[in-house]
């Protein structure tokens, strides 16, 4: 067995600097490992804090104002701005909660009601309505990008008939999973009846 020679000692001027860098690196690594952002379970509560209505409306209106290519034909649609609806946000929150409780993404709630039935039950009168759902996306940007990549979801986002929106997500407990793995998203779009 061949023995490796001992490493040459570092020049004395560089040794303290290297020790300080190694110590700093170890402290930084320890601090990051202990920080809430480094732990997946701490990264989960996006739904409770990151969905400010202004940010949601701004993000979706930015897309609607420049148009999106929703079909293979390449036709770009431009649509009027949306406004936040607390009523639609409540419907979206109820659906996200139902999906989390059922541990299943879908357009029907625990009582097997579709969107129109849920809107009516919440007292929202409408002339047009649409819903997008998703699971597993860690941020608003990620889920909107995914919806824009899907023809039918993009059609809903760019639908010129809808004027209002509500969006919600619900974090279900997914032990040891990715931060967004159990995050259920619901976007409800609607338009009040025409007068």
Where are the model-predicted features located?
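Bacterial peptidoglycan biogenesis and beta-lactam-recognition machinery
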Residues: 70, 105, 153-155
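Disulfide-stabilized extracellular recognition modules
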Residues: 126, 130, 134-195
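Solvent-exposed, polar/charged alpha-helical surfaces in well-ordered, non-transmembrane soluble domains
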Residues: 54-62, 86, 90-97, 117, ...
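Cleavable N-terminal signal peptides
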Residues: 27-28, 38
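A short alpha-helix/helix-coil micro-patch that ends at or immediately precedes a cysteine
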Residues: 41-101
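N-terminal signal peptide c-region/cleavage motif recognized by signal peptidases
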Residues: 34-35
């Amino acid at each position: 067995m061949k023995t490796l020679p001992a490493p040459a000692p570092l020049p004395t001027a560089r040794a303290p600097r290297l020790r300080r860098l190694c110590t700093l690196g170890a402290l930084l690594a320890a601090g990051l490992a202990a920080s809430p952002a480094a732990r997946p379970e701490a990264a989960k509560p996006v739904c409770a804090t990151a969905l400010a209505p202004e940010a949601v409306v701004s993000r979706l209106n930015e897309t609607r104002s420049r148009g999106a290519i929703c079909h293979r034909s390449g036709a770009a649609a431009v649509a009027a701005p949306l406004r936040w609806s607390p009523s639609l946000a409540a419907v979206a929150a109820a659906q996200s909660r139902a999906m989390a409780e059922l541990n299943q993404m879908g357009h029907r709630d625990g009582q097997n009601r579709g969107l129109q039935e849920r809107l009516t039950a919440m007292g929202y009168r409408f002339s047009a309505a649409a819903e997008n759902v998703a699971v597993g996306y860690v941020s608003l940007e990620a889920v909107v990008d995914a919806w824009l990549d899907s023809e039918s979801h993009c059609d809903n986002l760019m639908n010129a008939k809808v004027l209002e929106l509500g969006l919600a997500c619900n974090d279900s407990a997914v032990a040891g999973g990715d931060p967004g793995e159990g995050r259920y998203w619901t976007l409800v779009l609607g338009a009040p009846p025409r007068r």
